[in-house]
């Protein structure tokens, strides 16, 4: 396992996620988020909590890249990464995101947007991790002759 590549993949995907998160939440879904503002923290509170979110997001990306490396099957890294990202998104949706809709009074539109965004973003992050991660290649010399 190539831990240097795992770390690089995690950090690059994390940096991309910061940009994508801003574009998605503050631009593309701004209207949907505004329609659900009554169930969200005030913006000042969110800004104060961002460092916590960023740290745990980075930890999550290390786990994501490590899990990808453990399951890497030796094929096209980007394709394997997309497949891995979609699989992880389905786990996250089933165990976590859908429960936001069940537990909190968000609109069905917001819930659907979160689900679709999660699939697309995690597929993107999987592609990034798959493009960067390369396993350590072990070369074996010729067997000794007597």
Task: Label each PLM-derived region with a short phrase.
Residues 1-146:
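Juxtamembrane/disordered regions of integral membrane proteins
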């Amino acid at each position: 396992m190539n831990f240097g590549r795992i770390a690089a993949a995690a950090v690059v995907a994390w940096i991309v996620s910061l940009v994508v998160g801003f574009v998605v939440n503050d631009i593309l879904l701004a209207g949907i988020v505004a329609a659900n503002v009554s169930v969200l923290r005030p913006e000042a509170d969110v800004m104060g909590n961002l460092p916590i979110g960023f740290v745990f997001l980075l930890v999550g990306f290390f786990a994501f890249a490590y899990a990808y490396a453990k399951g890497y099957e030796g094929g096209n890294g980007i394709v394997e990464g997309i497949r891995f990202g979609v699989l992880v998104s389905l786990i996250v949706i089933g165990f976590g995101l859908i429960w936001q809709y069940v537990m909190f009074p968000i609109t069905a539109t917001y819930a659907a947007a979160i689900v679709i965004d999660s699939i697309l973003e995690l597929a993107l992050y999987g592609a990034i991790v798959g493009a960067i991660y390369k396993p350590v290649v072990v070369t074996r010399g010729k067997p000794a002759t007597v």
